[in-house]
Amino acid sequence: MIYKTFLLFLFPIIIFSQNKSYKVIGVKDGDTVEILMDGKPQVVRLSHIDCPEKKQPFGNNAKQFASDLCFGKKVKLSTGWKKDRNKRLLAEIILSNGKNLNKELVKNGFAWHFKKYSKDNSYDDLEQQARKLKLGLWNDKSPTAPWEWRKSRKKSSQQSFSSTSKIK
């Protein structure tokens, strides 16, 4: 009974929170923005997607695309209020025109559907369409997924560390 009462109390808060607007005060990269939430900055990691890193081809294009659509504007969040290991809030960003920023990035070829963390097939459909039309990064001959790029960078930095840290 107490649990049901708690849920009845919590449900309107969750619904209200998702209808609240937040100002985007920063765009860190294609899939990470900063919003003003209750007067404090909150970093938001766009769920379902992974954009190229800034040092990758199309990384800065993804950041600019996201920035053009949302920087300095009011947005809504569609979120389960979960955070990733870096304490970033995971969410879909809903723009003032009703479009979903996360989906717009995939649709225009600036992000991959991050299947490891998402089972939403609508993102996969958008990615396949962008690939077919050779939009954005799909115009590149051999685009490297960001998770593969990060993995290769991690391996090369570990190899260079181990070769420079031999005991004499």
What are these regions (language model features)?
Residues 2-6, 13-168:
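Small beta-barrel nucleic-acid-binding modules, primarily SNase/OB-fold domains
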